[in-house]
Amino acid sequence: MDIHQFDAIRPFEPTELPEVFDRLLQNEQFLQVLAYLYPGVPKEAIGMKMHQCRTNLDFQKAFCYDFLKNLLAKASLGISSDFSRIDLKKRHTFVSNHRDIVLDSALLHFELIDAGSDTTTEIAIGDNLLKLPWVKDIVRLNKSFIVERSLPMRQMLMASKRLSDYMHFVIAEKNDNIWIAQREGRAKNSDDRTQEAILKMMTMGGEGNIAERLKALHIVPLAISYEFDPCDWLKAREMQLRRDVANWKKGPMDDVISMKTGIMAVSYTHLTLPTKRIV
């Protein structure tokens, strides 16, 4: 496969990073986020550190890992996980329950790095979260690939096939891991049953019969549990509005507020992995 057939959904390639860094450093909203996260640090110093990152993984280690380490030290009682029965030299598709937009995959990355993995994961993220251009840049910089949702049925089938092809491409040819939620969106009612549509999508790519296509993705079930959910009131509000207000839709900043709320109030977290790979 040619990676350019996935240009519309893939993360940025290393050669694209300098241009992305420059674009972000000229965005006022992104600069406001930097000022909040790094008070007193000149944007020039941050820009220099960004441009020293040659790969997406470099960026994750230089910024995301250190940020999470400091955040956990200040705002959390800790995080626990056990990768002892997972071969981190092999590549896996972590199919996870979904509680927090940012932290679910970010904390997995944090624990993978601490466990000695030489990579993190590529993250499946819905295009409904990418209404702001700078947010789209950030997530693609952070090794995210895009799940297209707001499409007509015929286009949706084509998009699902491309998404599945890309996931198989990541495992087989890019030699990287994948994180994907087991259902569309966060489970606001704690119902963590895997949606059949997710599994069906995975079988649209690859080769062989259905079982062989799933097996090729090296699926590992992952459960993440937070002691407290700082976004619980936001989730309850959304569920109530969907119930009581006809045709209610989230605004462009609603998910950004959820991202910020979840990050700044992280609690004790536990990642649960199976004793052996299931598929």
Regions picked out by a protein language model, each given a short descriptive name:
Residues 87-91, 140-147, 176-183, 271:
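Glycine-rich, often proline-containing surface loops adjacent to acidic residues and nearby aromatics
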Residues 122-146, 150:
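Conserved nucleotide-cofactor-binding alpha/beta core module
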Residues 74-76, 156-161:
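A conditional alpha-helix N-cap/helix-loop micro-motif detector
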Residues 1-109, 113-120, 136, 140-143:
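Membrane-anchoring hydrophobic helices of lipid-metabolizing enzymes
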Residues 269-275:
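Conserved small/polar residues in nucleotide/adenosyl-binding loops
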Residues 161-261, 274:
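Membrane-associated lipid acylation/remodeling enzymes share a hydrophobic transmembrane-juxtamembrane segment
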